[in-house]
Regions:
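Flexible loop linkers connecting adjacent transmembrane helices
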Residues: 38-66, 90-92, 96-100, 104, ...
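Extracellular/periplasmic helix-exit of transmembrane alpha-helices
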Residues: 117-129, 241-257, 265-271, 304-307, ...
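Transmembrane helix-loop junctions in multi-pass membrane proteins
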Residues: 3-5, 35-40, 83-88, 166-176, ...
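Alpha-helical membrane segments and immediately flanking helix-loop junctions
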Residues: 59-94, 120-144, 155-161, 273-322
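N-terminal alpha-helical transmembrane segments of multi-pass membrane transport
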Residues: 1-82, 92-99, 110, 245, ...
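Membrane-interface loop-to-helix entry segments
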Residues: 24-31, 35-48, 173-180, 197-247, ...
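Membrane-embedded translocation segments of transport machinery
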Residues: 216-219, 223-226, 231-298, 303, ...
Length: 466
């Protein structure tokens, strides 16, 4: 059965992530960059000031909303996940070091794409019966385009619901149990193969935590995210910087390897496995899986923000992609490549490959810290995507379906704890591509609107409101 699913998925994935998809994703990013006059560069300083500078802002929010910082933390909770760890490792193993270069290119354009998504989400959002702000691609399609295009909103929401179970939950739980098993085996608590009982126990525990947070509503999601995301990011950055400092003499060579590998692709194992397009495909697809620019998902969380300034919140989107891909994904890639002489890329995969990079430098004890970081990354992603899925199901069927959906979503954590990692990543890649289609069409058609809103950045800066 799994072989048949893998075969079908392979055909669909090849089409979704083929040349047309690469052209569409990169093309929309270039178009938005041109129409906003490269806002991710022009206003980068403003974006940093209005994100990092707001970390300790404790301004009270209205009921049914999050603070702007809670919103960006929730969006980062959804984006800073296993794509930064297991996804980058997989991209390097299959596409070579050059995949990181294509992640950078994807992120540069993605910063503008995410800015556009967030700005449109705030501009076209609505309030539901509970007084909560609701927005995202479904709503900027519905409220920004004519009725004949509204089927795209339904299409997006349907694939959004399907995507959250794999991308948002199952793959994340799989990485949690994988990293925990690796840590336990490094300390000889487990012998040989990963223990299925450990996987099941962690699956049940995670499911209970997920239900407790998500069923607590938008306020609880925001409160958990604003505490968890900064902690996990700082912990991971410190660990990664330690590896870089201890291997500082090899860093220039690794960067040269990344750039040259982008145009002469070669797997980290040393064997030629394809053309430049393979490296590009792996880098761009994993980059999108990681930062979600082009998927529109992060804008769903940003739409909950207690702000009346769409462009101001759009600045958070620039920071989000920068932090996710340029910082954390790059650090992951450097950790793996700097530890390359001590790692078997054939035997290790996903999270295990990243953990091997840390243990090769620090020793086996660090697997506990990396397991904690990965558990935080994955759990935060599950929470963020739970919000995305609930908004999609609310758009399709109304608020009465939200709580039943969240119960089912929580239960999927148990299922995901015992599934095959490789097939999970492949299926998630496919659903990501399908979800991006209606969003990219909407961004293309609303690019003129984005241009008008982007002009407000300069005016707002002159007026002192940003």
């Amino acid at each position: 059965m799994s072989e048949k699913i893998a075969s079908i998925n392979s055909v669909v994935n090849s089409f979704i992530w083929g040349v047309p998809a690469m052209i569409c994703i990169i093309g929309v990013g270039i178009l938005l960059t041109v129409r906003t006059r490269c806002i991710q560069v022009r206003k980068f300083g403003v974006a940093m000031k209005n994100t990092i500078g707001k970390i300790f802002d404790k301004t009270q929010t209205r009921d049914g909303s999050m603070s702007p910082f809670q919103a960006v933390c929730t969006a980062l909770a959804g984006t800073v996940g296993t794509g930064n760890i297991a996804g980058v490792a997989g991209a390097i193993a299959l596409g070579g070091p050059g995949a990181i270069f294509w992640m950078w290119c994807s992120a540069f354009l993605g910063m503008c794409t995410k800015f556009s998504e967030v700005t449109l989400a705030i501009h076209f959002r609505e309030k539901n019966k509970n007084g909560e702000y609701i927005g995202g691609p479904m709503y900027y399609i519905k409220n920004g385009l004519s009725k004949k295009w509204h089927f795209l909103a339904v299409f997006y929401a349907v694939f959004g619901v399907l995507t959250v179970f794999g991308t948002g939950n199952a793959t994340q739980v799989n990485t949690i149990v994988s990293s925990v098993n690796t840590a336990l085996m490094n300390f000889n608590i487990l012998k040989g193969e990963p223990n299925s009982n450990v996987n099941l126990i962690f699956g049940i525990f995670i499911a209970a935590l997920v239900a407790m947070v998500l069923l607590g509503g938008i306020k609880r999601i925001g409160q958990v995210s604003e505490k968890l995301v900064p902690f996990m990011a700082v912990l991971y950055v410190i660990l990664a910087l330690g590896v870089i400092i201890l291997n500082i003499q090899r860093v220039p060579g690794v960067f040269a390897q990344i750039v040259s590998g982008a145009f002469t692709p070669r797997a980290a194992t040393g064997g030629i496995i394809g053309s430049m397009f393979l490296s590009m495909k792996r880098g761009v697809s994993r980059g999108i899986f990681s930062n979600e620019a082009g998927l529109g998902t992060g804008s769903i969380a940003h739409a909950c923000a207690d702000t009346d300034n769409a462009v101001h919140q759009g600045m958070f989107g620039i920071f989000e992609v920068f932090m996710d891909t340029i910082v954390i994904c790059t650090l992951t890639g450097l950790v793996i490549l700097l530890a390359a002489p001590n790692i078997s890329y054939v035997q290790a995969a996903g999270a295990e490959l990243t953990i091997s990079g840390f243990t090769a430098t620090y020793g086996g004890w660090v697997s506990i810290l990396t397991a904690i970081a990965m558990c935080c990354f994955a759990f935060s992603t599950i929470i963020g995507w739970g919000l995305y899925g609930s908004r999609c199901i609310e758009f399709l069927g109304g608020e009465k379906f939200v709580r039943p959906f969240l119960v089912v979503y929580s239960f999927v954590s148990i299922v995901g704890a015992t599934m095959n990692l490789g097939l999970l990543w492949d299926i998630s890649d496919t659903f990501n591509g399908l979800m991006a289609v209606p969003n990219l069409i909407a961004l293309l058609m609303l690019s003129g609107h984005v241009k008008k809103l982007a002009i407000e950045v300069d005016q707002a800066e002159k007026d002192g409101t940003i």
